[in-house]
UniProtKB/Swiss-Prot annotation:
GO cellular component: cytosol; small ribosomal subunit
Name of the protein described by the UniProt record: Small ribosomal subunit protein uS13
Family to which the UniProt record says this protein belongs: Belongs to the universal ribosomal protein uS13 family.
Known function: Located at the top of the head of the 30S subunit, it contacts several helices of the 16S rRNA. In the 70S ribosome it contacts the 23S rRNA (bridge B1a) and protein L5 of the 50S subunit (bridge B1b), connecting the 2 subunits; these bridges are implicated in subunit movement. Contacts the tRNAs in the A and P-sites.
Pfam families in UniProt: Ribosomal_S13 (PF00416)
Annotated spans, Disordered: 95-124
GO biological process, one term: translation
Keyword Lipid metabolism appears in the UniProt entry: no
Domain of life: Bacteria
């Protein structure tokens, strides 16, 4: 199993897909990385040479913010929004959807399970 920037890449997948196992790398960025390093995107991970693996590692470390660094940056951005008290920060603080989704119905993932209200009856 090839290990790249702290992530084990699956052996049997094509490189285009295998690179998406790294946090911060999707399909588009994966194809950009492979084009820049000159590696065929249909090549399987198990078929990579040590030289290609080293070239990939060097390119990713030099040009991309991924994994732990990216996670820390996202968390810092959220903390900053909460501290300055902007609308998005308030939504984060209250545990509600941040990007304008409706909350009268739905939004259960963000709001958690329904809480019953004592004394409230259904209207017929």
């Amino acid at each position: 199993m090839a290990r790249l920037v702290g992530v084990d890449l699956p052996r049997d997948k094509r490189m285009e897909i295998a690179l998406t196992y790294i946090y911060g790398v999707g399909r588009t960025r994966s194809n950009e990385i492979l084009a820049a390093t000159g590696i065929d995107r249909n090549l399987r991970t198990r078929d990579l040479t040590d030289d290609q693996l080293t070239h990939l590692r060097d390119y990713i470390e030099a040009n991309l913010k991924i994994e732990g660094d990216l996670r820390r940056e996202v968390q810092a951005d959220i903390r900053r929004k909460i501290e300055i008290g902007c609308y998005q920060g308030l939504r984060h603080r209250r545990g509600l959807p941040v990007r304008g989704q409706r909350t009268k119905t739905n939004a259960r993932t963000r709001k958690g399970p329904k809480r019953t209200i004592a004394g409230k009856k259904k209207a017929r």
